[in-house]
């Protein structure tokens, strides 16, 4: 089974870890902790404070994370979740595993990195490890929270537009819980 290195919100204790252990997404088995053999820039940026590993080997810091063995279904889910290849790119990376006796072993695993990014991202602070609640003060903004605020705004817009449409037509279509449509006609103008 393929190995995947996670360094950000998919790590244990981080906001998206639940996606990695959700069996409906596929199977993922924790193997060990590791760090990149080469330094990479791990930056936190964007409206949601997303951690990105920029595919610029030799720059930044050696990054700590976790290696998981995943089945094909989980790999496909991760590609979808990471919007690969449009948003992130899945590439192979060399990782160093520290053994209990002080020796190291090198393993190769897939990692989701950014090859396309804003030029100023290379000037952002880099990190060797990610924690959403870290000292950096850049807490990850849950996608669900962002979606909820977007939905709340769309709902408010919809309600306002519906009210205007009702006043215009003096009728209202109501969808009941059984899914039946009912037309309600008003005898006078709505106030």
UniProtKB/Swiss-Prot annotation:
Keyword Lyase: yes
Keywords from the named record: Lyase
CC per GO annotation: cytosol
Protein's name in the database: Gamma-glutamylaminecyclotransferase B
UniProt xrefs under InterPro entries: AIG2-like_dom, GGACT, GGCT-like, GGCT-like_sf
Annotated segments matching region Disordered: 155-191
UniProt organism field: Danio rerio
Record's keyword annotation contains Transmembrane: no
Binding site for substrate: 7-10
Compositional bias of kind Polar residues: 155-178
Record-stated family: Belongs to the gamma-glutamylcyclotransferase family.
General function of this protein: May contribute to degradation of proteins cross-linked by transglutaminases by degrading the cross-link between a lysine and a glutamic acid residue. Catalyzes the formation of 5-oxo-L-proline from L-gamma-glutamyl-L-epsilon-lysine.
Reactions that this protein is recorded to catalyse: epsilon-(gamma-L-glutamyl)-L-lysine = 5-oxo-L-proline + L-lysine
């Amino acid at each position: 089974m393929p190995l995947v290195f996670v360094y950000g919100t998919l790590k244990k204790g981080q906001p998206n870890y639940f996606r990695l252990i959700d069996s409906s997404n596929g199977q993922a088995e924790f193997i060990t902790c590791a760090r990149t053999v080469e330094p990479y820039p791990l930056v936190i940026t964007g409206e949601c404070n997303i951690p990105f590993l920029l595919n610029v080997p030799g720059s930044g810091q050696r990054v700590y994370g976790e290696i998981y063995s995943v089945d094909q279904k989980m790999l496909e889910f991760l590609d979808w979740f990471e919007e690969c290849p449009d948003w992130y790119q899945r590439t192979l990376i060399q990782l160093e595993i520290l053994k209990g006796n002080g020796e190291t072993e090198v393993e190769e695993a897939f990692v989701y990195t950014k090859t396309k990014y804003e030029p100023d991202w290379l000037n952002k602070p880099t990190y060797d490890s990610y924690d959403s609640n870290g000292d950096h003060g850049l807490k990850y903004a849950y996608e669900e929270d962002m979606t909820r605020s977007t939905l709340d705004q769309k709902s408010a817009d919809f309600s306002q537009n519906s009210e205007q449409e009702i006043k215009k037509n003096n009728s209202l279509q109501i969808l009941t819980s059984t899914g039946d449509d009912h037309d309600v006609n008003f005898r006078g103008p709505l106030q």
